[in-house]
């Protein structure tokens, strides 16, 4: 029998190891972003969930296209080594936002939409969005008491903005 920490938060059958490992890999890549990198999310709950995981990248919350357009003119985006990750919600509106954000921000820069696609494939059927990412990580034993458990390094405290 699997440990209880691998149970789905709603008491459904446990996540299989392959799916759990895929989620762990995505979370690890988010935690591994530098403070120069940017993550764009829709709301404050999304941002707070990422901070609970220990994400150090700058997180920009926006529900408005105007904020994204202002961001397009931001000097930080001129640097080619800045990674930009788009993480809107997984609903139809989120799919529209990710396309719009990508076209408004790309300007020859690489925009990471793969992280969103992988998270959507892992979480959408469970009714979990970006705002629930830290919660599911905790339920699966990847996060304990505001600490991200990275198998390759020491436990470190998550930083809140």
Pin down the residues of each PLM region.
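Short active-site oxyanion
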Residues: 33-39, 57, 83-84
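Phosphate-handling DNA/RNA-contact segment within nucleic-acid enzymes
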Residues: 1-36, 44-48, 70-72
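Small/polar loops that bind or transfer phosphate-bearing groups
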Residues: 41-43, 89
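Alpha-helix N-cap/helix-start capping motif
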Residues: 43-44, 65
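TOPRIM fold recognition
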Residues: 2-10, 52-53, 62-161
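N-terminal G-site helix/loop of the GST-like fold
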Residues: 45, 52-55
């Amino acid at each position: 029998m699997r440990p209880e920490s691998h149970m789905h938060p709603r008491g459904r059958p446990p996540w299989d190891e392959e799916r759990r490992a895929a989620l762990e890999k995505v979370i690890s890549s988010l935690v591994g972003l530098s403070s120069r990198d940017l993550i764009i999310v829709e709301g404050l709950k999304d941002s707070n969930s990422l901070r609970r995981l220990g994400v150090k990248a700058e997180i920009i919350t926006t529900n408005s296209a105007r904020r994204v357009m202002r961001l397009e003119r931001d000097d930080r985006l001129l640097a080619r080594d800045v990674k930009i990750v788009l993480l809107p919600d997984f609903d139809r509106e989120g799919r529209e936002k990710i396309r719009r954000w990508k076209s408004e921000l790309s300007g020859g820069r690489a925009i990471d939409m793969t992280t969103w696609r992988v998270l959507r494939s892992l979480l959408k059927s469970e009714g979990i969005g970006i705002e629930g990412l830290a919660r599911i990580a905790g339920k699966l034993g990847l996060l304990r008491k505001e600490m991200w458990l990275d198998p390759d390094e020491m436990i470190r405290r998550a930083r809140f903005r």
